[in-house]
Structure formats: structure tokens, C-alpha cells
Design a protein with these regions (language model features):
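Non-catalytic terminal/accessory regions
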Residues: 1-90, 95-96, 102-446
Length: 446
């Protein structure tokens, strides 16, 4: 019982059972392993029991793994086993957790393992890593028309996503409800419980999709990723959940001939420009996320006005961060060094912008917050004067912005312009926390 990958003999044996029985058995074994390993215990000697995860409901497995990683932050060996179990399960919700770890995790070894497993699955299916992420986004039970259909037997209910990704329920008469009603006399209690369970799971899953896909679309913008028009329509605009996020972003279509066109999808499926004119998406065009780095001042201003006029809350800012000028071969920015703040304020801003604590040095200090951009193989590094672990509130100052690839410095002129602009904005956000102090090196020593 050493291998948590159950895609061999365990999967074969589970396939001999009724699907519901196999899922129940698998869940019982995996839950027992986690219970034994939680807090003071360790079940690593029997990690092969996680092979049963191959037969679990992927949503249940995803929830268990997320909770374990959140509540047991230092268990690297267990994390390694769990990501292998996610890989073996191979269904959408399990893979989304695997892909999330592959994109960003505080343990580099666990992140590397997850990334390698994700590449393995993508290769098996004939997809790129990014295609795998696109094609495995859960729908939370919503149909292609954007509706969640729930049944009590004779009574039918419909769930619709609100703008903040909550689910609003309506009955057959169109009356809106916050939740599903209790069963009536004569209605099957099991059917009612199943509908309520489905709604609860859908609400949780929709919230997870909002968080994970917002992050992924932001990284796609930073990486200047492109989609063939047909794939963009199918996998993004046509997805019942991601499609709602797509309407809160500005896109660029570049046809084989001619210049790029910027547009925004509306909730009724139309594509419109900043001037409200309909934009035709050519079949052979490539689509990418727009950014201030590739827009004129006039275009950016027009889109700002458009978003206000339509009452659209952008999923994230595409129109503010400008590309800084850098010299050839320059490897760091230091023009915003010496801005004074405290370690808690700096930490809060860095974490909010997607960064995590950098490597802890031998003396128990750290002096950077880092953010990985896996698709580009780059890590952004926001330097500061440092703090101790465990942390206390103390004076600190900003120092630098750098980028690394596999631990080595990367010249700034080789960083994609959009990524450079966005990380420069992160650097500026830290500097904005406090004024410049000409004696910062003395004032902010850790």
C-alpha cells in the first residue's frame, strides 16, 4: 500500500461494483485515511489507500483535499500523495484542484509534482496544459443555456447565477426564492433531499469557479495568451459559468488580415465595441485579453466610459497599468525603494495581489514576496527590507522588483510587456503604503 495512484488494479476492482457503491466505498477509505492522518497522527505508511480516490466523486475528493491542505499546511509528503490521488481520479473538479496547486503553491516541490502530473494528463488527452485547464472547468450542474434545473418530481425549480456568482432560485410561477422549500405531503423525501444537496453543491462550486477562473484569466492576460476563435467561443464564451466572467472583460480579436479589434461580449451573446457597434468575430481570428499596454490613450478612455455606461464591474483592471521603460539587460527596478510602511500592511497588500512569502533564510528572516506565472516559467519578486518568522509588526521599506526563471535573474526587457506592467503596478502599490525616507536603510533594518 505504497502507491496512491489507483488507475491500475484498484480502478479495475471498483469498476466491478455499482457506480454508487464504488463511490461510497472509495469515499469511506479516503476519509478514513485522512482522519488517521489529521493533526497528531500519520497514515503515510498506508498512503496506497488513497488509490481508492480513483473511484470517488470528484467534487467530494476536491473538497477533502482542499480542506486537508488548508488545515495541515506543513505536510509536504501528504500533499505529494494527495495530488497523485487527484491525478488518478482524473475528473474535472479533482483536476481543477490539481491545476490550482500546479499554478501556485507555497511548497515548490509539491507545485512541481502537481505541474508534472497535469502535463501527463494533458499529454494523454492530446491537449496543451492550458487546454486541459480550459476543458475541465466544472459547470456546477448548469446547462448550456445558463440554467440550473432542480426537480422535486412534480415541482420544478430553476437556478440562475447573479452577477456576484450567487444562485437565485425561482419556482414554476417565476417567484424568486432564497432557497428550496420543504417537501410537501406526498413528495418523495429522498428526491427533495437530492435536489437540496445539488443546489448546495452548485453554490459551493460556482464560488470556487469564480475564484479560480478569475485568477487564471488574469494570468492569461499577463502571458498574452491567445485562443483560436472557435475554441474561445466553445470553452470560454460558451461555458455556463466562465461565460459570465467573459462578459466582464475586454477582448481583442486579431484576424489573419487586418488590424486587431477590441470587443466585449454581452450577456445575450452579442460582441460589441466601445462605441456599442457590433463586432464580427472572424472564424480564423485569434482572441486574447486586451490590456492598456496594447491600447491607445483614446481606446482606453473609450472603454472606461463604456464599462461605466453599461454598469459593468470589471473582473480585474485591464486599463491602468502602463509598461515602464527599462534598459537593455536591466535586471531590477529600484526607483521605488525606501518607501516606509510596516510588515503587516505590506504583507496584506502583497497577499491581496496574489503574492506569497518568499524563501525563509537561515537566520529565520525573509525579504521578498513572490508570485509564480507558471505558463511563462517566470516568478515575480517584490523585495523589501525583511521580516522575521514568525512575524511581528515592525517597520520595513520597499526595495526592488525582479524576475527569476528557475532561480536565475531574468532581464526586464525579456519579460512580456503586459506582465511587466502588471508587476510594476504591484511594486507601486507597496510603495504607496508609505512615504519615502532617505535614511530607509537604517530606519528599516530587520
Amino acid at each position: 500500500l505504497k502507491d496512491p495512484n489507483g488507475r491500475g488494479i484498484i480502478a479495475l476492482y471498483l469498476s466491478l461494483l455499482e457506480e454508487s457503491d464504488a463511490a461510497a466505498l472509495a469515499a469511506r477509505v479516503v476519509r478514513a485515511w485522512i482522519a488517521q492522518d489529521t493533526y497528531v497522527g500519520s497514515a503515510m505508511a498506508d498512503k496506497g489507500l488513497l488509490a481508492f480516490a480513483v473511484g470517488m466523486d470528484d467534487g467530494e475528493l476536491a473538497g477533502l483535499v482542499r480542506a486537508y491542505m488548508r488545515d495541515n499546511p506543513g505536510r509536504r509528503a501528504q500533499f505529494d500523495a494527495l495530488v497523485r490521488a487527484l491525478c488518478a481520479n482524473g475528473r474535472d473538479r479533482a483536476l481543477q484542484v490539481l491545476l490550482g496547486v500546479a499554478r501556485r503553491h507555497k511548497m515548490a516541490g509539491v507545485q512541481a509534482t502537481a505541474a508534472a502530473l497535469a502535463r501527463e494528463i494533458a499529454s494523454e488527452r492530446g491537449w496543451s496544459d492550458e487546454e486541459l485547464a480550459d476543458r475541465t472547468v466544472p459547470t456546477a450542474g448548469f446547462d448550456g443555456d445558463g440554467l440550473l434545473r432542480l426537480s422535486y418530481g412534480d415541482r420544478e425549480f430553476t437556478g440562475r447565477l447573479t452577477s456576484d456568482f450567487k444562485i437565485e432560485v425561482s419556482d414554476g410561477a417565476g417567484r424568486t426564492r432564497k432557497s428550496l422549500p420543504p417537501a410537501r405531503s406526498g413528495e418523495d423525501a429522498e428526491v427533495v433531499r437530492a435536489a437540496k444537496k445539488r443546489l448546495s453543491a452548485a453554490r459551493k462550486e460556482a464560488k470556487e469557479v469564480l475564484t479560480l477562473q478569475s485568477e487564471r484569466l488574469y494570468e492569461a492576460m499577463c502571458a498574452s495568451r491567445t485562443w483560436p476563435a472557435a475554441e474561445w467561443r466553445e470553452l470560454l464564451a460558451g461555458h455556463p459559468l466562465v461565460g459570465r466572467l467573459v462578459t466582464r472583460l475586454i477582448w481583442t480579436a486579431t484576424p489573419p488580415e487586418g488590424g486587431p479589434l477590441t470587443f466585449r461580449p454581452t450577456e445575450d451573446g452579442a460582441l460589441i465595441g466601445a462605441d456599442d457597434a457590433v463586432v464580427e468575430l472572424e472564424p480564423h481570428a485569434v482572441v486574447s485579453l486586451a490590456h492598456r499596454a496594447r491600447l491607445t490613450d483614446e481606446e482606453a478612455a473609450a472603454w472606461r466610459e463604456h464599462l461605466v455606461d453599461y454598469g459593468v464591474e470589471p473582473l480585474f483592471d485591464q486599463l491602468s497599468a502602463a509598461v515602464p521603460r527599462v534598459a537593455k539587460g536591466q535586471t531590477e527596478m529600484r526607483d521605488l525603494q525606501g518607501h516606509m510602511t510596516d510588515t503587516f500592511a505590506l504583507r496584506g497588500t502583497a497577499l491581496k495581489r496574489g503574492y506569497k512569502r518568499g524563501e525563509v533564510l537561515d537566520a529565520g528572516t525573509f525579504d521578498a514576496y513572490v508570485k509564480d506565472f507558471a505558463a511563462l516559467g517566470l516568478t515575480a519578486v517584490l523585495g523589501f527590507t525583511g521580516s522575521w518568522v514568525p512575524e511581528d509588526k515592525m517597520v520595513c521599506a520597499t526595495t526592488s522588483l525582479t524576475f527569476t526563471r528557475r532561480g536565475r535573474p531574468v532581464p526586464l526587457d525579456r519579460v512580456p510587456p503586459v506582465l511587466l506592467a502588471e508587476c510594476r503596478a504591484d511594486y507601486a502599490a507597496l510603495a504607496a503604503l508609505g512615504p519615502y525616507d532617505p535614511d530607509w536603510e537604517v530606519s528599516a533594518s530587520p
